[in-house]
């Protein structure tokens, strides 16, 4: 059993689950990126088969990194705009109180953050006006235009509207589709964790998991492990804050007795 690999975390993922999810199926051999060769187990019927031992090992490493990072208060952004994964991305991010982009990556979403923040402020303003019924007090044509603008902004910014600053770590599903996000992270020095299929470039990712990035079942399993790792980190962070708060109270109490 693959679970004998001494995972960093108490991962429940097994080899059987990974195989059942089709996590080992890569792309057609003719479409491969030679840099992925160390993570390919074999070729069958012109399809590359990913080495699941490598997948598991890299997932352990990424999970530990996530937990350690979130334990010190770092924030995570999930990115995945492919139609088949967009809802999975939002669900995973919301489940672990993180941020997400699942509609379209806007140019400069991170590198031009100050401009994006203005758009977020506009979205929040429109949502507030609608919530308080203010749009019903202006001409219908003008109200319709504002509602349309709100919906457009919400489509792209809903997942990051509560993100106060650029994230510390970005989890990317679909390197080819999210290459602009990859480049912006590289430019800003933001660490990335990427699910890499056999046609991807591992040199563009800080940490990566060799795995099928098209299968919904495969992505669900991997996102589930990310969420677990993040939640563990959040629990650690909350406990540290509580201990710090208790310590401050004790010090204050001792000083008041002097």
Curated annotation (Swiss-Prot):
Organism: Tupiella akineta (Green alga)
Compartment list: Plastid, Chloroplast
Name listed for the protein in its UniProt record: Small ribosomal subunit protein uS2c
NCBIfam families the record matches: rpsB_bact
Gene Ontology, cellular component aspect: chloroplast; mitochondrial small ribosomal subunit
SUPFAM superfamilies documented for this protein: Ribosomal protein S2
Classification lineage: Eukaryota, Viridiplantae, Chlorophyta, Ulvophyceae, OUU clade
Keywords recorded for this protein, A-Z: Chloroplast, Plastid, Ribonucleoprotein, Ribosomal protein
GO molecular function terms noted in the UniProt entry: structural constituent of ribosome
Pfam families reported in the protein's UniProt record: Ribosomal_S2
First-listed, main subcellular location of the protein, grouped into a coarse class: plastid
Domain of life according to the entry: Eukaryota
């Amino acid at each position: 059993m693959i679970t004998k690999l001494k995972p960093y975390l108490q991962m429940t993922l097994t080899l059987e689950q990974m195989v059942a999810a089709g996590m080992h199926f890569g792309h057609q051999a003719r479409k491969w990126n030679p840099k992925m060769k160390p993570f390919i187990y074999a070729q069958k019927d012109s399809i590359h088969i990913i080495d699941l031992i490598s997948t598991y090992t890299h997932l352990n490493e990424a999970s530990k990194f996530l937990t350690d990072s979130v334990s010190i208060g770092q924030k995570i952004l999930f990115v995945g705009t492919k139609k088949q994964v967009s809802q999975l991305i939002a669900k995973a991010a919301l489940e672990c109180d993180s941020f997400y982009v699942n509609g379209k990556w806007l140019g400069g979403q991170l590198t031009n953050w100050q401009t994006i923040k203005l758009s977020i402020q506009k979205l929040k303003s429109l949502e507030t006006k609608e919530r308080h019924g203010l749009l019903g007090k202006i001409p219908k044509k003008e109200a319709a235009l504002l509602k349309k603008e709100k919906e457009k902004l919400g489509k792209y910014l809903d997942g990051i509207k509560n993100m106060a600053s650029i994230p510390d770590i970005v989890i990317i599903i679909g390197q080819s589709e999210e290459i602009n996000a990859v480049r912006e992270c590289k430019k800003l020095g933001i660490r990335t964790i990427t699910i890499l299929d056999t046609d991807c470039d591992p040199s563009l990712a800080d940490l990566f998991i060799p795995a099928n990035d098209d299968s919904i079942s495969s992505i669900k399993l991997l996102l589930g492990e990310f969420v677990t790792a993040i939640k563990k980190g959040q629990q650690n962070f909350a406990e540290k804050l509580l201990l710090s708060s208790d310590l401050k109270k004790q010090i204050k109490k001792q000083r008041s007795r002097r």
